[in-house]
Amino acid sequence: MINQKRSFIFPLILSCFLFPHHLFAEYESSFDAKRLNKIDFMLDEAIQNKEIPGAVGLIMQHGHIIYHKSFGFADVNSKLPMTNDAIFRIASMTKAVTSVGVMMLYEEGKLLLSDPVSKFIPEFKGSRVIKTFDNQGIITETRAAKREIQIMDLLTHTSGIGYPFIPSKLSKTYAEAKIIDGLTADSIVLEDLIVNLADQPLLFDPGSSYAYGLNSDVLGYVIERLSGMSLDVFFQKMIFQPLGMHDTYFYLPQNKQERLVTLYADKDGNGIEVSDGTESDIYLDDPNYPINGSKMMYSGGAGLSSTAYDYSRFLMMLLNEGQVRQKSLLSRKSIELMRTARFDTDKDGELDFGLGFDVINHLKQSTELASVGAYAWGGAFYTTFWVDPEEKLIGVFMSQVRPVHSDAAKKFKNLVYQSLN
């Protein structure tokens, strides 16, 4: 077997301090241990087939760690084993953290979700929408937006703002304006990115459709403007420290840099190789952006790196309706609002976007095991999470591959659910 198994007793003890026993009903595991072992064999096979270099999987139920194992390698060439405390680029799993930050400011009365973004970032006043463009992708005419972008539009990706790496009518415009996806080792700061973005047209009128885009990056700048702190300091002071998250950063301190997992690419499904940042739709000027370069960009949409265990602490706060250490990071009603489905993202109503993640509305056409009301999201470099309020369950899967041709993350989730008694 390739898997590197690590003890999870110490994290379990910590979880008891973070989420006191009285916050959960008396606990009796709902899992079949023999069925859980199927995960080990599946991940070993994915590694042997060179689909992924390695992975860390974590399952927590009722605040107790059920499963926390590492497999394969953090760096294949040096045969550096994957460990439970390996640090991964979590990319869009950053978005849920940013959404929590916005909701914290909402609860402080510093903003309304119906507020126009221009109230905090004046450059967004008078946004325009694409009207026509030519066959070369050049926009030839725009019109005034029917209304301004609101905070809620950013939270639900219904603002009309796109992503450079997702093909759209804005692709050429974003390229010419040098709009980035938020990940860089260059000397670019969040303010410059957002002010530049505000000058670009929208794909559609705010609130009228859905397009995944740089919305959480804009929200990150709103947090900076309202809190008077950089997004980095706000996250550390207001979220990570209260949750005891000691391994989650935009840029890793020197004593933790060696734990960053190497990024791989599987261009054509024939096996992984070390990524140079140019193989996928997301261009990286440096795949090692969490440790190299200027370290000036704080992307609220994609910038964080973390461990499976650290991120599980954040997810447990969501599952426990904002409660942590007998205090409320957020109120129960705010968490309820965040996990309320708002905009259909898969055309059949099964998945709707909440405030930072997809929410499962029904299972009528589902091909995966899940629960109605569960919510989930993932990152571009093959990390994913889900929270299941019905089963009092969270799952985290982390690897580092893009492009990826593996089904390991989906299989991990299905194998977790098939292990429930």
Regions of interest found by a model, annotated:
Residues 2-10:
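Bacterial N-terminal signal peptides that target proteins for export
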Residues 11-21:
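Bacterial N-terminal signal peptides
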Residues 23-25:
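Boundary at the C-terminal end of the N-terminal hydrophobic targeting segment
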Residues 27-90, 110-112, 126-134, 406, ...:
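Short, conserved catalytic-motif segment at the N-terminal edge
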Residues 37, 43, 63, 89-120, ...:
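Active-site SXXK
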Residues 125-372:
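Short, surface-exposed loop or secondary-structure junction motifs
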Residues 372-389:
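Low-complexity, glycine/alanine/valine/leucine- and proline-rich hydrophobic stretches
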Residues 384-386, 392-401:
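Short, well-ordered beta-strand elements
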